[in-house]
Amino acid sequence: MILGAFLATLNQTIMSVATPELMVDFNISAATAQWLTTGYLLVNGILIPITAYFMQRFTTRQLFLASMVIFLAGTIVSAVSTTFPVLLTGRMIQAAGAGIIMPLLTNVIFTIYPPNKRGAAMGMVGFAIIFAPAIGPTLAGYILENYEWELMFYGMIPFTLLVIIFGFIYLKNVSEQVITKMDIISVILSTIGFGTLLYGFSRAGSEGWSSSEVLVSIAVGLSALGLFTRRQLTSQNPLLDLRAFKYNMFSLTTIINIAVTMVMYADMMLLPLYLQSARGYTALESGLLLLPGALVMGFLMPITGRLFDRYGAKWLSIIGLIITIITTIGFIDLTDSTSYTYLVLMSTGRRIGMALMLMPIQTAGLNQLPSSLTAHGTAISNTIRQVAGAVGTSLLVTVMTNRTETHFKEMMSTGGNMAGQEHMIIEATIQGINDAYVVIIGIGLIGLILSFFIKRVGQVSEEDSGAKIQKVMIKET
């Protein structure tokens, strides 16, 4: 299962380096190319709420094998694609399979291990998953420099087949099946809500925030999610049991996770764009720059897990966010002559900060939930993280695009001429990226402030959970 999650994560990270080249090959804008990432995260965000139902309805073995087969189908479609719409379709099919894997893996960990050992277990999972971003950009860079981009997908096919074969032979079931009826109305509301909301954020990059298309999409999305939330809170068999938010540490860490995820995913988009589009570095050089930080991050994850089991998440989160914010400040004054070594050091520092807080924050919230809500809590946590990543990426690309345009107009109005237009475009792009990093710092500060309120709490028993939910239902009626 960890190997399957590794492949899904690897597939997601290789696109950050490939985006600039795909923009040229398909003659598309950054806002359009961003859909390869946003669309992937969007499908994850739509599908993951349903995984809580899937994890109860199907066995671990059935669900994992089905998700890997879907992922394989999407990989094949992406590999043979010759147009951007076909490539995007393949990516979304991949996302449908990948969206099931991580919630399923997390749920298995929380089923097998007691609360006082989950940090170390999640740390080992984190090591395997973080190793994918460590080699993903470098591997993608090497392929793009020496071969065609299609090889990134063709190369994944045999490994996915091996995971399916090994899963079929060795994977055992660890959860009990619960036969329940799927709430189709909830599925429709969830799909419309997350789909239109993310579409609105993505279109804002090219259409602007005053566009009626953007405003209507966001309004429809928020309305549908409001109806979805109401239905989950009043249903006897909710698709996604939102009563998990009645547990204070789960709610708090979920909000912090939103901020942390937006900071992490946005940087995965901005730095490759700066390196390749503004500085002229190759895809391989861009990937190599990200390699040291990702390797250090992967190495620290198991250590962080053990520290969490011993000390809790509060100070790991605070220290991690402080390091992340300080090193992100180093990215707000980039120029066309910023040294490669400086970028490596700042990027590595950001990854160290991320390693200290990612798994502890998620594990701290899920640890409080009773066993009956673990699957729902896992699905909620992963849904929000995926949506936050997509919204964060869309928001930061919007900021970068709009600020780049503003800076370019200012340069032209202060004596710029057509002869130096190419240089001004590069300079305006760099300044737009700097402005986007300022927004990242602001989001990180919100997460830092909230981290001071994290407390170490134990898992709520099923008896206490039942009493708490009964009180909630009485209030609702």
For the regions a language model picked out, list residue spans one by one:
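Helix-loop junctions on the cytosolic side of multi-pass membrane transporters
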Residues: 165-186, 207, 230-239, 402, ...
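Helix-loop-helix hairpins in multi-pass membrane proteins, especially solute transporters
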Residues: 41, 48-185
